[in-house]
Amino acid sequence: MKEVSKTGHFKIDLPSSDAATALSGPGNAFLKKFESLTGVSLTIRGLQLEMNGVIPKLERASALVELTRPIWEQGLEVPEVDLNAAFSSLNMGESSSHAELGKKVLARSKEGRFLRPRTIRQKEYVESIENFDLTFAIGPAGTGKTFLATVCAARLLNEKKIEKIVLTRPAVEAGENLGFLPGDLQQKVDPYLRPLFDSLHSIFGFDKTNSLIDKGIIEVAPLAFMRGRTLDNSLVILDEAQNTTTSQMRMFLTRLGERSKMVVNGDITQIDLKNEQISGLVEASKIFQQTKGIKFCYLTVEDVVRHPLVQKIIEAYK
């Protein structure tokens, strides 16, 4: 005879009306998403969350509520990407590690949002930047490689542990030659550097970013501009590193100066180099894998924190 699972009823006390509102989401959107993931019924009555369903599912649902507590407890709505990341951690048996994510607040954005890693691998990446002078991050688009590195740089700058933030990337990533593009130098390189400015604007705001650039505290420049320099007291971020050649990667890495850190980011599935050139990032991942003082972090589609469809799109193109 098939055993019938027992049903049950769980209650969780909520600390405030703001927390209750955040946990519900607009039009109960969060509760509905929660129900679709866990298979239990959720209702908020006053300052209590009530859950009904079979016991095993109730236990998982309760665990999922607790994993997202650091967000909704502060009266903040739980983004779908955070809910999905928590659910994924629960499925992989990593709930204890995921519970620490909410405590890892790196900074606050200009709008007051808490900036923090959203997945376990993102947390490991942030901790690598904190503990190593050279960190490589390899993973698909949307996994927060550049954004989190920039947030870490902002935090170090605020704590006066560095004096400068340098963001760079190859200026030619689609086979175009700058000499044949219209406009002056700034107009030519701006489209390639725009993603870096976007990260800065989301952290510092437009006006403060421009002010820090004017003061020379933040520098955003093509990779070629790094040649011949020694970068001291800085956090230097190389973005789109998969599109560097071996010689460019070597040039960049040897710019590391005293009391500085470097972060090298890239997606080795999106290499735009031509003429069968070897990617400097791919080669570096082979020759530095066992080098003491250098850390490699690998992010996956499960770490994508853009629109939920992005994960599905990346998976579909594999």
Indicate where each model-derived feature is located.
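Conserved helicase motor core of SF1/SF2 NTP-dependent helicases
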Residues: 110-122, 128-238, 242-318
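Proteins enriched for Cys/Gly/acidic motifs involved in redox and nucleic-acid/cofactor modification
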Residues: 87-118, 130
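A short, structured beta-strand/loop element
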Residues: 36-43
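Interdomain "pre-motor" coupling segment immediately N-terminal to P-loop NTPase/helicase cores
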Residues: 43-102
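Flexible glycine-/small-residue-rich
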Residues: 14-16, 44-46, 53, 169, ...
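Short amphipathic alpha-helix segments
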Residues: 19-36
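Short glycine-/aliphatic-rich beta-strand segments at the starts of folded cytosolic domains
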Residues: 2-21
